[in-house]
């Protein structure tokens, strides 16, 4: 359920000029011009002038920050039933990213792990040729898990994914 009272419409530039604090497009893993061309209109460039719908959130340090609604909610397309909310196709569907915990601390830890996982997945998805394959261990829990999946007919490879978190 999306609380429409937390939504704001505008470009990052116009929202910043209005005194709000939108996330910068450069802070996200985005499609390159080449990828946008390759997908033949499925996605659009996301920059400071892109008109979109934003949702209010908070940074880890408690600062209010606006982020594109399409990067937060899986069901963002349903917003058209409730009003005019521009949502350009600036990103692939966000099927993950929800985090919770029994305490504030555990929720924050889970959220940080989710951010790292999503960032690594997007780096891998958008740059598969740049990710070197790593050797699969011969013994131990990872080897057992790999064997379990191979026994079910799956092909397994492990890749190294460079990311801004150095993990």
Where are the language model's segments positioned?
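Helix-coil modules at protein/domain termini and other flexible surface or pore-lining loops
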Residues: 1-167
